Amino acid sequence: MAVSERRLLAAMLAVAAAAALRVAAESEPGWDVAAPDLLYAEGTAAYSRGDWPGVVLNMERALRSRAALRALRLRCRTRCATELPWAPDLDLGPDPSLSQDPGAAALHDLRFFGAVLRRAACLRRCLGPPSAHLLSEELDLEFNKRSPYNYLQVAYFKINKLEKAVAAAHTFFVGNPEHMEMRQNLDYYQTMSGVKEADFRDLEAKPHMHEFRLGVRLYSEEKPQEAVPHLEAALQEYFVADEECRALCEGPYDYDGYNYLDYSADLFQAITDHYVQVLNCKQNCVTELASHPSREKPFEDFLPSHYNYLQFAYYNIGNYTQAIECAKTYLLFFPNDEVMHQNLAYYTAMLGEEEASSISPRENAEEYRRRSLLEKELLFFAYDIFGIPFVDPDSWTPEEVIPKRLQEKQKSERETAVRISQEIGNLMKEIETLVEEKTKESLDVSRLTREGGPLLYEGISLTMNSKVLNGSQRVVMDGVISDDECQELQRLTNAAATSGDGYRGQTSPHTPNEKFYGVTVLKALKLGQEGKVPLQSARMYYNVTEKVRRVMESYFRLDTPLYFSYSHLVCRTAIEESQAERKDSSHPVHVDNCILNAEALMCIKEPPAYTFRDYSAILYLNGDFDGGNFYFTELDAKTVTAEVQPQCGRAVGFSSGTENPHGVKAVTRGQRCAIALWFTLDPRHSERDRVQADDLVKMLFSPEEVDLPQEQPLPDQQGSPEPGEESLSDRGSLHKDEL
């Protein structure tokens, strides 16, 4: 049988299979033969006349019909692409021999367009007449806005289907978070008997986004073991969603309004226009899949961020093989990321060079990147030659993918935009300066007056306030605990570490020049209960954290109680052989409740940052070591505004926001021990371990044993503290595992 005959037979079989696919789809339970636009119109008409069962019937059918049509498009395009791929011998690249033989060139074109026609025939037979599956742009927008659920929640409520009403209302509100009426409806539903928390379901939730957000939440709660399966599931669902999104891009050409009246193009220009539009749509899937209705902007670098979360989560559970695989995969997208290279080097050292070298990046990520870069090359080429705009949704695209002429044009446009922005910015700064000069003095007085509440306990003294520390919402106090208490808590840390503190005595991947031991309040109490550490030391640890919480709450004159967000007693020890020419820090400058971008002078308050943290404190247990000073900076992470030297019984407290970037200098000799505490004003984010610790303390001790010393009616600490013998440069510092 000739090659052409075999191709024709394959095409006929594919078209027949496509027709069978449509018949099979129409016989499925979810298929509704009526068009979604007609069903939606019937539903709105039923709503107008108060026919609530009619609203439910038609709106539910409209949603099912639209979902079935979407599924049919996906199946047809996937099936036809699989059954009728481009012919293996169809070389689409330049062939010098074709220019010498016009007949061969014509045959080449015919083979190409023959493949196109056969694919089109397959799709036509599978999808059916175009009129059967086209929705108007306006109606598609209504479905995307989740409007059917707005009608459904009222109708369900009217016919006493409360569980469905709650789910429909919640689904609509997730897509329309500014809709005040629906917010009021949801508040009302929450007060009704019989309504459960599980009823508030998003019926349109995207599986990949649901798993990602759940995984990130568990990651932020420092539960890496539980976060990993959700982040891995998010990746699997992402690639499925990406293929579906891309398949749906292969629709009719969008003429953009009435442009079709003036559209005039030859064969190849028309093909180019349509294909580039399809490629643009496919690249835009990056943005679509990274978007969530509750966010103003999509997640930045959404796919690579999965591997970033996973590499550190796997490290935290001791799985270096997977940590290396995810780190290498992340580096496919950002090959110059210094921190990731440091992490990879650390993981490699822990696993072994030979075994680590055999681990490759994930294959599906490599394929994704290769395909995406090829598409970008075509899109940038079309932008450069035909002027068809393309906005790259990714920040990881290598510069060499963009044509040089286009690079120069974009550079010129950026420089112009920057110049205009700077001129506007300078003008705004002048105006702001005039306003600030008038308000700054009164604001400073207000802040200082607000701070300076009682220190509650005898022996505690104010060492530095916000004014001395050159900032706001900052304080350093001494005498919080005694020398004996410091030594006992230090012994507790080292004893708990030998009993298993969850870190296995290893160094952090970010600070390979130090090792650390740590123990939480709950862990210490459990070890005390088991007799592995002195129970009274664990009780002291619990009491001291409560003492610091009360003092911070009082000093900053907070109207709302502080709740523990996380508590950690940790010791960091310098590794002697690793200190030569050391330039790193125990922890670089950061902000406790947002992601600091020092270059842009901004801090993004979103996960994985602990956005719910409001105040932070660190209580030092010793000062007999070198380095390890705590320091505050400006948002640029370079300009140091104050520095604090640790010593026994000294506490540093501050608000956790952008006003207080801070870091920790390297510990170059000895061991630095401290209790790190984070607090929240939101009881919903109260530390679960603390609640368990409270219950365990009640079980193990009598009320008299856990009562703190009587709070003293001391005067407010409003004035500037008396300067001590130390200068600002002699005072204290910290790390993510601390502050």
UniProtKB/Swiss-Prot annotation:
A motif (Prevents secretion from ER) lies at residues 736-739. Residues 709-718 have a biased composition (Low complexity). Glycans are attached at N319, N470, N543. Fe cation binds at H590, D592, H662. O-glycosylated; chondroitin sulfate. One of its GO terms (molecular function) is L-ascorbic acid binding. Residues 1-25 form the signal peptide. Pfam families: 2OG-FeII_Oxy_3, TPR_leprecan. One of its GO terms (cellular component) is basement membrane. Residues 404-442 form a coiled coil. SUPFAM superfamilies: TPR-like. Its EC number is 1.14.11.7. It comes from the Eukaryota. This is Prolyl 3-hydroxylase 1. The active site is at R672. The keyword Iron applies. Its cofactor is Fe cation; L-ascorbate. Its main location: endoplasmic reticulum. Basement membrane-associated chondroitin sulfate proteoglycan (CSPG). Has prolyl 3-hydroxylase activity catalyzing the post-translational formation of 3-hydroxyproline in -Xaa-Pro-Gly- sequences in collagens, especially types IV and V. May be involved in the secretory pathway of cells. Has growth suppressive activity in fibroblasts. Belongs to the leprecan family. TPR repeats lie at residues 36-69, 146-179, 208-241, 304-337. It catalyses: L-prolyl-[collagen] + 2-oxoglutarate + O2 = trans-3-hydroxy-L-prolyl-[collagen] + succinate + CO2. PROSITE patterns: ER_TARGET (PS00014), FE2OG_OXY (PS51471). InterPro entries: Leprecan_dom, Oxoglu/Fe-dep_dioxygenase_dom, P3H, Pro_4_hyd_alph, Pro_4_hyd_alph_FE2OG_OXY, TPR-like_helical_dom_sf.
